[in-house]
Amino acid sequence: MNKSELIDAIAASADLPKAAAGRALDAVIESVTGALKAGDSVVLVGFGTFSVTDRPARIGRNPQTGKTLEIAAAKKPGFKAGKALKEAVN
């Protein structure tokens, strides 16, 4: 399912126009992104938790040349599925 299909599903499920469903989805995405940028996690009980983890710097290798290089530390967004979501999928 892509974003436009998700908007269609939200519009049908919530009996909203597609434009309103699209704005609602965009607002959710912006809110989650903003919270993660601020260093907070977003917990949706039963669905899952969005969080940011720190990935330390490491040594990598260019596969074409074999030369080693340092890969900088980075922040990595993550998602851990909640119990209800896991049960619904299985």
Curated annotation (Swiss-Prot):
SUPFAM superfamilies in the record: IHF-like DNA-binding proteins
Keyword Acetylation: no
GO biological process: chromosome condensation
GO cellular component, one term: cytosol
GO terms, molecular function: DNA binding; structural constituent of chromatin
Keywords attached to this entry: DNA condensation, DNA-binding
Keyword Lipid metabolism set for record: no
InterPro entries the UniProt entry points to: Hist_DNA-bd, Histone-like_DNA-bd_CS, IHF-like_DNA-bd_dom_sf
Domain of life: Bacteria
PROSITE patterns in alphabetical order: HISTONE_LIKE
Function text: Histone-like DNA-binding protein which is capable of wrapping DNA to stabilize it, and thus to prevent its denaturation under extreme environmental conditions.
Subunit and partners: Heterodimer of an alpha and a beta chain.
Family: Belongs to the bacterial histone-like protein family.
The name this protein goes by in its record: DNA-binding protein HU-beta
Gene source species: Pseudomonas fluorescens (strain ATCC BAA-477 / NRRL B-23932 / Pf-5)
Taxonomic lineage: Bacteria, Pseudomonadati, Pseudomonadota, Gammaproteobacteria, Pseudomonadales
